[in-house]
Amino acid sequence: MKTKVGFNRLDRKSSHRKALLKNMVISLFRHERITSTKAKLSEVRRFAEKLITRAKVDSVHNRREISKFIHDKYILNKLFTKISPIFKERKGGYTRVIKLGQRYGDAAEMAILELVDKTLGEK
């Protein structure tokens, strides 16, 4: 019998879930910190960590693979030129989740996802 394996479906169809994750990853790389529910951020964290790991080696192949996921050229350039060099020596754990407590309206667990070394200073 198949059991739930791999990831949280977030109560959405696959196309909606993929679009949500892409948009949230782009927002994370643009602002270096995002606030949302804990369930969404744990899924976004998985994708963001994989993309940063791949971006640490700047090759044409890696740029093309990441551009399948990130369609914004500015964010793609920022990932390869500003974000990934900061994490060259780090083996993993590029992001952190800070729990905020429950949202007032529906008591959903809220959290902040941010890049660990925020020395980019591009705000």
Curated annotation (Swiss-Prot):
GO biological process, one term: translation
Matching InterPro entries: Ribosomal_bL17 (IPR000456), Ribosomal_bL17_sf (IPR036373)
Signal peptide limits: none
GO CC, alphabetical: cytosolic large ribosomal subunit
GO molecular function terms listed in the Swiss-Prot or TrEMBL record: structural constituent of ribosome
Keywords: Ribonucleoprotein, Ribosomal protein
Cystines in this chain: none
Subunit structure: Part of the 50S ribosomal subunit. Contacts protein L32.
Family (UniProt): Belongs to the bacterial ribosomal protein bL17 family.
Protein's name according to its UniProt entry: Large ribosomal subunit protein bL17
